[in-house]
Amino acid sequence: MTAVTSQSAESLARKGYSVAITVASKPRERAKMSTAEVISKDETKVVQLAEELLKKCPPSKTSVVDFLGAQYDMGLAWVHFPVGLGGLGISPKFQKAVNEVLYPAGAPNPMYRNPIGHGMCGPTVAEWGSDAQKKRYLRPLFTGEEIWCQLFSEPGSGSDFAGLSSKGTKDGEEWIANGQKVWTTLAHLSRFGLLVVRTDPEAVKHAGLTAFVVDMQAPGVEVRPLRQMTGEAEFNEVYFTDVRISEAEMLGSPGDGWRVSLTTLMNERVSIGGSMPQRGSGSIASAVNAWKALSPDQQDSATRDELMKLWIRAEVLRLTNIRANTTRKMGTPGPEGSIGKMAGADLNKETYAFAVNLQGANGMLYGSYAMTRPETAMAFDGVQKAFLRSRANTIEGGTTEVMKNILGERVLGLPGDVRVDREIAWNKVARN
């Protein structure tokens, strides 16, 4: 017997799960409970649900899609989302309790199947989408049946995202999109994309943007690979030529594109730089393994000291990310997520460089630079590839220079850069 809220009981019962209503699910009685009692009830509830999910859908005997679908239906996808939309309507901090039950048991991690969708687009659709959009998109996004991409950066507006020039023109009940996006991760696999275009060129640049969900298989959408120094092409450039988008696919209202994109970007920076791996995992694990592979006479004190400095930085970053994730899981991702993104990018580059250097001449050997189209953006395929791939960490998801501006202005309260185009209509701003 599993304890759930009264709202979710009916929907779970229809799917064959045994349910009961807890005293804590009754608003009046819940209001009388102490904070500690509510937390205890909620954590017990999600742990019980997670354990029941493992019993009904053993990861070793259940397909990834079926398991994640059942996880979504039980409200364990994003626990803070509403009932019926992958959540239980409780505090997002209890997602950690769910993950701590599921992942050690071998449950699939949705981030590996659909990193952009799960970490960035899903929260944006949940925040800004219509009821119909939430019901249509969130479940297959979580299961990975429909991969998503983020269509923000352009050749002339990467760091200056608000200056983008792709156009959206209204035509009856549709909008027609034209323009080019670049550095679009996994666009070649994506079924849908989160697209921001300029719909009012006479407004100031931040005010004239509108966001849409776009069908990546629609006529007029062309995806071209961008080959990276690893030999792969996980990034793409995407061209839109008279692509028709229903007005029903708008996120928010016309002109809300900047605010919609901030939701995405705040989640992106926590998603990229604010993950909470176990102590000693990630890039620092590669450095430790490279150290262990050395012969005793090569394990000198200077190299050990360098490794320990990297370890300490990795641990400081891990603890900082825990704090940033706590803020996000309370429903308020903020600019502090830029700390993890910036520090993590620099640390990855230095740590993988250290690991490669320890291998000596073998560190220069790389299997193949053959052009490939990866099935995920998160696969690890050796230290050499990780070293090459880490070069992009200080660029993707916002450059380190942009992160420093965000931290200086929004966290430290320092004066902002002089922006002469802040109050000028976009179509009046001089361009090269």
What role is predicted for each listed range?
Residues E37, V221-T320, N393, N427-N432:
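Glycine-rich beta->alpha junctions and the first turn(s) of the following alpha-helix
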Residues T2-G117, A126, A132-R136, P140-T143, ...:
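Amphipathic, small/basic residue-rich leader segments at the start of a protein or domain
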